[in-house]
Amino acid sequence: DVFFYQADDQHFIPRSLLIDLEPRVINGIQNSEYRNLYNHENIFVAEHGGGAGNNWASGYHQGEQFVDDIMDMVDREADGSDSLEGFVLCHSIAGGTGSGMGSYLLETLNDRYSKKLVQTYSVFPNQVETSDVVVQPYNSLLTLKRLTLNADCVVVLDNTALNRIAVERLHLSNPTFAQTNSLVSTVMSASTTTLRYPGYMNNDLVGLLASLIPTPRCHFLMTGYTPLTVERQVNMIRKTTVLDVMRRLLQTKNIMVSSYARTKEASQAKYISILNIIQGEVDPTQVHESLQRIRERKLVNFIDWAPASIQVALSRKSPYVQTTHRVSGLMLANHTSIRHLFSKCLGQYEKLRKKQAFLDNYRKFPMFADNDLSEFDESREIIESLVDEYKACESPDYIKWGMEDPGEANVVAALDSKLVV
């Protein structure tokens, strides 16, 4: 009952809200086989149905307009929870609704529920192909500021890497949205198994995230999953062992973020923390032996200023989902190479900003009225500082980083008392 509650007729209803500024996607859900799954009172579609036009400022402004209606739904669900621990937001950072309205919701949740955790699953745009959204760099930068300041944990879902995995690992020449989304849903499902099938450890959101995020701002996680299959491969059977799964999780080709790259600079990056969630029939002694082998072979490069250990959580498999493999694994990792993804976003932003391109689209809205573009400048500074901090994490002297004033240590520790323990 973590993610569901029972209605009077005993069927289960998700504790979820579906929010959009245009009706196409939600109408698709309401006309599908899932139409009776969701609580219809928890579905919000803007009356005008015009969307945000792929404009962050439009989405943010409409978030201000509709915040009372949306927060009424949030408050109702929160009041119906026995022990509310936090919120999970699924959104994209490139368009208008997910980025703009998502940003406003992040700020509002952080303000109204300041003691609760906010975790996001954030879809980053494809960095290789030309985007249909010409203002994508502006939208991404403005959203990244909110993800840095208002979220406690961000699971990065990188479209560039997801497409690469679909092509290279699943051998799909032209992956569909449904096939890419199945990768995302696999990650989301696996990352919540310890909450849905609680054991002795990692059975709540704080316990899951506290060890992964030792410092408040470095809370962007990358994921890896193995073995990956698509529908047509369901009948393919192979032998899976704990060591095989844990070793594969560390391979670059299985990481779902493109910044975990094949460049020389990225290869010098380090792990801040790793949590492997292993599902299936597993003997704890196998886990211990696998960790020992990984340590002996020096397969992992950890930072110098924190414990260098891979944490492992064992979880049961769902009895309702049939799989052909005995053992599967998800890696949640805090890795300094994530900064290269942010640097790409900054680089794309700088190209557009130098040309002053498409800024009139933003000046139409209150935040950017009277040619006030300070929001862009502030967002850029925050993301540059985030990139610098991830770079500093690779140094043994990171603990002293940015602490010119002795009192600053206390300020940093107080930034996020929800996670820093």
Curated annotation (Swiss-Prot):
A GO BP entry: microtubule nucleation
Pfam families: Tubulin, Tubulin_C
Keywords (A to Z) from UniProt: Cytoplasm, Cytoskeleton, GTP-binding, Microtubule, Nucleotide-binding
Disulfide bonds: none
Taxonomy, superkingdom: Eukaryota
Keyword Signal: no
Residues holding GTP: 94-100
Database matches in Gene3D superfamilies: Helix hairpin bin (1.10.287.600), Tubulin/FtsZ, C-terminal domain (3.30.1330.20), Tubulin/FtsZ, GTPase domain (3.40.50.1440)
GO cellular component assignments: cytoplasm; gamma-tubulin ring complex; microtubule; nucleus; spindle
Subcellular location, record wording: Cytoplasm, Cytoskeleton, Microtubule organizing center
Transmembrane portions of the chain: none
Molecular-function GO terms, alphabetical: GTP binding; microtubule nucleator activity
Signal peptide extent: none
Main location class: cytoplasm
Function: Tubulin is the major constituent of microtubules. The gamma chain is found at microtubule organizing centers (MTOC) such as the spindle poles, suggesting that it is involved in the minus-end nucleation of microtubule assembly.
Protein family membership: Belongs to the tubulin family.
PANTHER family: TUBULIN (PTHR11588)
Protein name as annotated: Tubulin gamma-3 chain
Gene source species: Zea mays (Maize)
Lineage: Eukaryota, Viridiplantae, Streptophyta, Embryophyta, Tracheophyta
